Amino acid sequence: MEAIFCGVGEAFDKHLSNTSILVVDDSQGSRRQVLLDCGFSAPGPFWCHALDPSALDAVWISHFHGDHFLGLPQLMLRLFEEGRRQPLTIVCQTGGGATIKAAMQLAYPGFSEKLTY
């Protein structure tokens, strides 16, 4: 298992992007990738550090502060633009689906209806 730090800063750090960690596990003979948190500054570093961004299996959201989840709309849009079709699992607290849908609608109105994954 490998942990790739895509960011180690806090919400208002002017030098480092939000804390976000890409966990890559090859132990079962197939690669699994999980992104731990996806704050507003996390998508760019994720694309720089991920070996295969389209192979992302899941995103785990620790809690619903902007610096932990507001990068999700950008991440999902980019995956869509690059042709992603397989499902993306999002793990979050109970009731978080409505919060994510609201963020998607605010960031890119109508986009979530176009998602094919």
Language-model segment annotations:
Residues 1-117:
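Binuclear metal-dependent hydrolase catalytic cores
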